């Protein structure tokens, strides 16, 4: 599965797990969306970014350590505003399987990391898998909804 298709697949896999409360905010042009999923809760809209990486690529296994994009984004409808991270939280998905057993479609083969946006390094454009293992909450697919809810609830209480 190529990177673009895998990214869309993982976004939709997570969206299906978090439905019906979380929805995709875009109607037809999701490439321009500033976040991947959103939900209304407590009078506000919570926004979620989903990032993914996999060791197995179409050309074979990658040996370099994975990095996940967290760069601030510009809202092209408001070019006068500086770029920023628009989501409240990030879900990072890592697929480490290689060889014939690797199946990007299998949620059980993915490891997920949940991080509040404000916990991300403010001056970095990417984070490594090592950083996520040290600083984010690692979960399996089935635990993702509960851990994400807990992280966002804790974040809301700190405001």
Regions found by a protein language model. Give the residues of each.
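Nucleic-acid endonuclease domains
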Residues: 1-46, 51-159
């Amino acid at each position: 599965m190529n990177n673009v298709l895998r990214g869309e697949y993982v976004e939709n896999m997570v969206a299906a797990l978090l439905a019906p409360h979380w929805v995709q905010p875009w109607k037809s042009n999701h490439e321009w969306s500033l976040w991947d999923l959103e939900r209304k809760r407590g009078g506000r809209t919570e926004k979620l970014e989903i990032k993914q990486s996999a060791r197995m690529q179409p050309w074979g296994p990658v040996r370099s350590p994975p990095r996940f994009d967290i760069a601030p984004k510009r809202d092209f409808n408001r070019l006068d505003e500086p770029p920023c991270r628009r989501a409240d939280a990030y879900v990072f998905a890592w697929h480490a399987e290689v060889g014939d057993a690797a199946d990007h479609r299998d949620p059980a083969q993915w490891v997920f990391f949940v991080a509040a946006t404000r916990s991300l390094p403010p001056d970095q454009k990417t984070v490594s898998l090592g950083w996520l293992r040290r600083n984010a909450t690692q979960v399996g697919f089935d635990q993702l909804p509960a851990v994400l809810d807990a992280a966002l609830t804790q974040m809301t209480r700190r405001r």
